Design a protein with these regions (language model features):
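A structural signal for multi-pass alpha-helical bundles of membrane permease subunits
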Residues: 2-227
Length: 227
C-alpha cells in the first residue's frame, strides 16, 4: 500500500534535492565564470568574487590560437569516426559468429575476448607503442585510432544482442534461399540497430576521454587530441 508523504516530509526532500543540485552545479558555473575573468581576478582568494568585473573573451581567443584547438578538434573527431566505423563492423561480425556459428575453438576464442575485458588497458600500451614504432606510424591519425579499432566490449555487446534473437528468423531466411552472409547482412544485422547505436555512443565516449595513449603515441602537439 502506498504511503502518503506529509507536507513537511516533501519540504525536507525538496530541500535536500536543492542542496545536492547546488553542490553539483556551483563548480561547473564557477569554472565557466572564471573563464571570463582576467588572470588577476581568477587567482584572487576572495570567495565572494564570483562574477567577473567585465565579461572578457580574450582567454578563449588566446587558448584557441596558442593551443591550435581547430587541429585538435579535427584529430579528435577523425579518431572517433574511424573507431566507430571499425568497432561497429568488426564487433557486429564477430558477435554474430560467436552467437550463431559453431566452429572449433569458438568457446576458447570468446573466453579470450572476455579475458581481454578484464585486463587493464594500460598493460597493452607498451606492446602497442612498439608495434607502431616498428612500422613508423607514430604521430599519425592511425596511431590515435589503433587501440580502439576493435573492441572486446563491442564483441560481447553484439553477441548478447544476437543471442536474444529467435532462430526462427534465420530458419525462415534459409528457407527463402539465403546463405549465411545474406542472412547476416539482410535479416539479422538490421535488427540490432539499437545495440549498434549504444556501441557507437560508448566508443565515442571512450575515445573522447582517452588521455594516456594520445600522450604516449603522439608527441607532436598538432597530432594529439583534446584530452
Amino acid at each position: 500500500m502506498n504511503r502518503k508523504i506529509s507536507r513537511g516530509g516533501k519540504i525536507i526532500i525538496y530541500l535536500v534535492l536543492l542542496f545536492v543540485a547546488f553542490v553539483m552545479v556551483v563548480p561547473f558555473a564557477w569554472m565557466i565564470l572564471t573563464a571570463f575573468k582576467t588572470q588577476s581576478e581568477s587567482t584572487q582568494m576572495n570567495p565572494f568574487l564570483i562574477f567577473p568585473t567585465a565579461f572578457r573573451t580574450e582567454a578563449f581567443v588566446q587558448a584557441w590560437e596558442e593551443l591550435n584547438f581547430g587541429r585538435l578538434y579535427l584529430n579528435t573527431f577523425a579518431m572517433i569516426f574511424i573507431r566507430i566505423i571499425t568497432c561497429v563492423v568488426t564487433s557486429d561480425m564477430a558477435g554474430y559468429a560467436f552467437s550463431r556459428l559453431k566452429f572449433k575453438g569458438s568457446k576458447f576464442a570468446f573466453g579470450l575476448v572476455l579475458f581481454q575485458m578484464m585486463v587493464p588497458e594500460q598493460i597493452f600500451v607498451i606492446p602497442q607503442y612498439l608495434m607502431l614504432s616498428k612500422i613508423h606510424a607514430l604521430n599519425t591519425i592511425f596511431s590515435l585510432c589503433f587501440p580502439g579499432l576493435v573492441s572486446a566490449f563491442g564483441v560481447f555487446l553484439m553477441r548478447q544482442a544476437y543471442m536474444n534473437m529467435p532462430r526462427d528468423l534465420e530458419d525462415a531466411a534459409r528457407l527463402d534461399g539465403c546463405n549465411i552472409g545474406q542472412t547476416f547482412l539482410f535479416v539479422m544485422s538490421p535488427l540490432t540497430k539499437s545495440s549498434k547505436v549504444a556501441l557507437c555512443i560508448f566508443t565515442a565516449l571512450f575515445g573522447y576521454k582517452e588521455l594516456l595513449w594520445p600522450m604516449i603515441a603522439n608527441t607532436d602537439n598538432n597530432m594529439t587530441t583534446l584530452a
